[in-house]
Amino acid sequence: MIKVLFVCHGNICRSPMGEFVLKDMVKKAGIADQFEIASVAVSREELGNPVYPPARREMHSHGVACDGHHARQITRSDVDKFDHIYYMDSSNARYLERLFPGEQKFRAFLPRNVADPWYTGDFTQTWLDICEGCEKILEELK
């Protein structure tokens, strides 16, 4: 089982987009049974909240459902459980380092920051970045 975890600030935009896009990709590739995919936040700000409505709309416009998601914060058990943990930007990396000093599992989702659409308002660009990163991850892991 390949275990993938996506991390962003609040777990209501970028990391759930990563989670549900990759779930959709592995399902379409017929390999969903080989993957466990989830997403979390580094902060506690949005705990329990669903996917942010503009992010949900962007995903739905591409046929990707994200129903049932509720934001949660990363835990030590997540770090222990997941083999591949991807953060969306350098701020997330700093939070992760503070929460789990010296942990070596954390990797950048892309070689550049994925801008937070909560601030930019550009959910389409975030969608494109997420798809790019998920395609690369899927290629590397399958």
Feature locations, PLM:
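Phosphate-binding/catalytic loops
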Residues: 84, 88-142
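Conserved active-site segments centered on acidic
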Residues: 1-78, 139-142
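Cofactor-cradling patches in redox/metallo enzymes
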Residues: 81
